Every structure is written in C-alpha cells, then in structure tokens.
C-alpha cells in the first residue's frame, strides 16, 4: 500500500521510495535525496511544441536522476504541490524546488 499516490501525474511514494511510472518506471531512495525539483523541457518542431515534465532528484553524492512525470499543462505545478507538501512533512531533509 502506497503512502502517497498521484494518479494524474503518475507519482507514487512507497515507504522511503519515490516512484514515477510515466514513460517507464523510475525509482529513487528518498533517504539519499538531498534536493528535488520540477523541470519543464520544451521542444519545438515546426509549428508544434512539446513540453515534457521531469522531477530531478539530486542525491547526496550530487548525481542527478531524471524521473519523467505526466505534463497536464499549466496546472502541473499546482497538482505537484500536494506531492511536495507530503515530502516536506515526511522527508524534511530534502530541499524542494529550485
């Protein structure tokens, strides 16, 4: 049973692990994460643009892990706030945001 689940963004927190399952499954141990932030990459192709959302987890050894999440448009940051609130309350050692 997951302690936190966001089906919209495809994020799970299970015990001490952050799991994303959008475009594959990625897992990181939250006890080893020092910094976590949201990054949006916009790719332009002709007249169309594609926005990809990724959580970047920086471990204490300064290695960065990219964890894709579902981009739901302009409300992605608002939806992600509940995940950050949970992490803030249960993993206070993690620096959240930029």
State each model region's role:
Residues 1-15:
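Anionic N-terminal interaction surfaces
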Residues 6-8, 23-25, 60-64:
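Glycine-centered tight beta-turn/hairpin loop motif at sheet-sheet or coil-to-beta transitions
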Residues 9, 16, 26, 55-56:
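Residue-level detector of beta-strand structural context in well-folded domains
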Residues 14, 29, 97-98:
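Helix N-cap / beta->alpha transition motif
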Residues 18, 27-43:
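Phosphoinositide-dependent membrane-docking surfaces
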Residues 18-19, 65:
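Short, isolated positions in well-ordered beta-strands
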Residues 19-20, 48:
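Short loop/turn motifs at secondary-structure junctions and domain boundaries
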Residues 36-98:
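Acidic, Ser/Thr- and proline-rich intrinsically disordered linker/docking segments
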């Amino acid at each position: 049973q997951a302690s936190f689940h966001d089906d919209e963004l495809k994020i799970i927190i299970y015990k001490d692990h952050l799991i994303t399952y959008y475009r594959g499954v990625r897992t990181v141990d939250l006890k080893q994460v020092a910094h976590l932030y949201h990054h949006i990459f916009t790719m332009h192709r002709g007249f169309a643009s594609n926005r990809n959302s990724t959580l970047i987890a920086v471990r204490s050894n300064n290695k960065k892990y990219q964890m894709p999440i579902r981009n739901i448009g302009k409300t992605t940051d608002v939806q992600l706030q509940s995940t950050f609130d949970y992490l803030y309350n249960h993993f206070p050692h993690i620096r959240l945001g930029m």
